[in-house]
């Protein structure tokens, strides 16, 4: 796991993902997330869950949460409705989780729990949550087989009436139809530095694109696997592990929050061993 942690830290050093609360960009992200969740809480499934748990603290887990922007925004929307919240933020990046603790204290006035763990192994912990959240640029980190394991693990730690919220974006439509796949893409360009992502291959058996993230002028680089998920593909996997799935568009019809309710109780340990096809995967 140490190698994975080191790789993620390297990715987020090169990739310009804003996490500093003093930045206007991060404050804007936080405000936007709060508005999304405040509106989402009017969904009938969430109303039912909140009514059921109104006299008890809601256990909320923000998965792959980084600095906790999504989880903190959701917790604030819940607390503003008068609900008690216990927030857990999960990630592998220790530096990001330190920020999550500070930001939660500053914004929510509460101490939160942080969990340094591979999200595929959440079921190995003694957690029983009411609400789980995947927010931000998260799903592209997981290939289809990992996504199955991830959702199985999350469903396992939720209560029988628990709900999983997943922010998703139709990247098939946006990237391959609207924009066009780029061999070389400037992810960030400023006076001080440039961050490029460069096509380095495709694995047809895992469905991931290989891209090198390159920082200029330091020339630090890292090879990443990227899966371009769409709304329907993610929703179908959610449906495998939850009894019903809905979608609430946010900015556009191709971006929003997937809502999955009532876990089916499928044991994630059934997916411990990857299928033979993955072992034989190859790059083109």
Where in this protein do the model-derived segments appear?
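A short SAM/SAH-binding and catalytic strip from SAM-dependent methyltransferases
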Residues: 130-146
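A short glycine-rich, Lys/Arg-flanked "PGG" loop and its adjoining helix->strand segment in the class I
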Residues: 148-160
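Class I SAM-dependent methyltransferase SAM/SAH-binding core
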Residues: 71-121
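C-terminal lobe and adjacent flexible extensions of AdoMet/dcAdoMet transferase-like proteins
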Residues: 241-284
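Short amphipathic alpha-helix with an adjacent loop that forms part of the alpha/beta core around
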Residues: 121-127
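SAM-dependent methyltransferase
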Residues: 167-235
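Class I SAM-dependent methyltransferase "Motif I" SAM/SAH-binding loop
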Residues: 64-69
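Conserved class I S-adenosyl-L-methionine
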Residues: 1-57
């Amino acid at each position: 796991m140490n190698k994975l942690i080191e790789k993620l830290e390297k990715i987020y050093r090169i990739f310009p993902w804003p996490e500093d609360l003093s930045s206007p960009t991060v404050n804007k992200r936080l405000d936007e997330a709060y508005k999304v969740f405040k509106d989402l809480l009017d969904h009938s499934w969430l109303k039912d869950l909140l009514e059921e748990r109104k006299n008890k603290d809601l256990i909320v887990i923000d998965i792959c949460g980084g600095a906790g922007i999504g989880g903190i925004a959701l917790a604030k929307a819940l607390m503003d409705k008068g609900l008690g919240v216990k927030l857990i933020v999960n990630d592998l990046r220790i530096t990001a989780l330190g920020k999550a603790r500070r930001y939660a204290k500053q914004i929510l006035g509460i101490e939160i729990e942080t969990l340094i763990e591979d999200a595929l192994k959440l079921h190995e912990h003694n957690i029983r949550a009411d609400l789980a959240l995947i927010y931000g640029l998260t799903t592209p980190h997981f290939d289809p087989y990992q996504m199955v394991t991830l959702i199985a693990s999350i469903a396992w730690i939720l209560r029988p009436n628990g709900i999983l919220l997943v922010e998703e974006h139709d990247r098939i439509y946006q990237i391959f139809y609207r924009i066009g796949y780029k061999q070389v893409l400037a992810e960030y360009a400023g006076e001080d530095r440039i961050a490029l992502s460069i096509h380095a291959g495709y694995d047809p058996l895992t469905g991931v694109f290989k891209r090198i993230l390159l920082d200029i002028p330091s020339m630090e680089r890292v090879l990443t696997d990227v899966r371009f998920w769409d709304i329907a593909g993610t929703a179908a996997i959610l449906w495998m592990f939850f009894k019903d799935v809905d979608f609430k568009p946010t900015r556009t019809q191709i971006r929003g929050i997937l809502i999955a309710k009532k876990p089916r109780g499928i044991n994630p340990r059934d997916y411990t061993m990857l299928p033979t096809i993955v072992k034989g995967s190859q790059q083109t």
